[in-house]
Amino acid sequence: MLLGVITLFPDMFQSIVRYGIVGRAIRRGILSIKLWNPRLFTYDRHHSVDARPYGGGPGMLMMIEPLRNAINQAKDELGNNIKVIYLSPQGRKLKQKYVYKLAYDHQKLILVCGRYQGIDERLIQTEIDEEWSIGDYILSGGELAAMVLIDTISRVLPGVLGNQDSKESDSFSKERLDCPHYTRPETFDGMKVPSVLLSGNHDEIHRWKQKQALGRTWIKRPDLLNYIQLTNEEKNLLSEFKNEYLLSLNKKTRK
């Protein structure tokens, strides 16, 4: 997969391309990332990339020409069939199912990172195919959002993760949270690993993990359950979890 990034701060991406999952994807030849700085596509002596907004208002806006020139250069180098994405708080909120779609439906993406108060609306109208947001909060620029998108796309590309099951069991991979996980030591400060995980009974372990994942979703992100079509078995597991959870709460209040 080819990813192009339009950014005023290309050095910010040096760590993500060298380490972790993204670095592994690049070393294995599964992912390639190229960076273009709009400042290199300016023609005035100050290399201006921002200006005051018409109509007044606080802050500065990124100018259309340097951005468009950088995008055009990226398109020339990356080739045809490219989707251009603007990381923006006005964009559609990113979810795991959309990550799969972006990763599997497109071999080439260009990510445009805004700065200041944003970018000239005319660029959005003429050059941007989609706007995506990573959440309802404000960042200083689109670079961190682009890194989030790059990382999450890298995880779902075939051959990147050492264990294919890892991405399938991740939180949100099936529109639900992941189950709790435990490792050594078996007992820590009096807290023990659930006995079922030590039993060796794979069917019971699988059942426990399913129930805990559904229960954790119900407790922490109940909104996600509105989008899940539960099987009868999953409904029973969730009902069991609720009963056990409420029973444990009653015991705590009695103490």
UniProtKB/Swiss-Prot annotation:
Keyword check for Signal: no
UniProt binding sites for S-adenosyl-L-methionine: 114, 134-139
GO BP of this protein: tRNA N1-guanine methylation
GO cellular component entries: cytosol
Compartments it resides in: Cytoplasm
Catalytically driven reaction(s): guanosine(37) in tRNA + S-adenosyl-L-methionine = N(1)-methylguanosine(37) in tRNA + S-adenosyl-L-homocysteine + H(+)
Enzyme class: transferase
Chief localisation class: cytoplasm
Gene Ontology MF annotations: tRNA (guanine(37)-N1)-methyltransferase activity
Subunit-level organization: Homodimer.
Role this protein plays: Specifically methylates guanosine-37 in various tRNAs.
Family stated for the protein in its record: Belongs to the RNA methyltransferase TrmD family.
Protein name as annotated: tRNA (guanine-N(1)-)-methyltransferase
Source organism: Blochmanniella pennsylvanica (strain BPEN)
